[in-house]
Amino acid sequence: MVTSTGGQGPLEGAVIAVAGAAGPAGRATLMRLAEAGAVVVGSDSNPERLAEAVDAARYAHGGATVIGETVDLLDLDQTREWAARTEKEFGRIDGLVHLVGGWRGSSTFAETDLGDWDLLHKLLIRTVQHTSLAFQDALERSGNGRYLLTSAAGASKPTGGNAAYAAAKAAAEAWTLAMADGFRKSGGEQGPRAAAAILIVKALVHDQMRAERPNAKFAGFTDVKELAEAIAGVWDRPAQEVNGQRLWLTPEP
């Protein structure tokens, strides 16, 4: 069981689970949460990349508790077991950061491949459904829990070639807002004991992308380090203030 060390901020000693921890956004988030003093439990379907991400966060912040678990988030039972195992080992869960991503698109609406929808439904919707259902109770028990989804501005202003992606992102947002309403109702007059919120970007950029395309401007893109900073900052605000909110990291369309 983990207890707060009485450190400098709300994340000191907090237990945060990160789904999709092995990608660039996941790596940056592991780093930032470890820096803030959190116990970080990352999951991913790629064990090799997950191990690299966990090792990097541990190395950057010596003494930080950062662990990784290979979890199939398309399996609800596995996802529930991950949540139960994490709460049993560390005594509570104060956050679930959902960073599972993927993209498929086409040149025009007419060329949309419905196979892309099938894939994106699994990656962008089903994993959100499973993590939210698996972690909801533990986040409320925390008293300061957060469920954070990263989404794209395109969900609010879809383009013809992005039909499947935008629709999947919009569905994931709706699901997360429904979770937020559940938190609101269960909190009653005292306000929600946990919050579900959505961080919205145009797109993400990281150092490797810049190295591969040195002349690209990536206008309006959010660096994964900026996203990680915004994620950590959500715990600085009261649950009632952020619950059910879209937190825009790019201009709202």
PLM features: what roles do these ranges have?
Residues 190-194, 198-200, 206-207, 214-253:
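C-terminal helical subdomain
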Residues 38-52:
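Conserved glycine-rich Rossmann-like NAD(P)H-binding loop of the short-chain dehydrogenase/reductase
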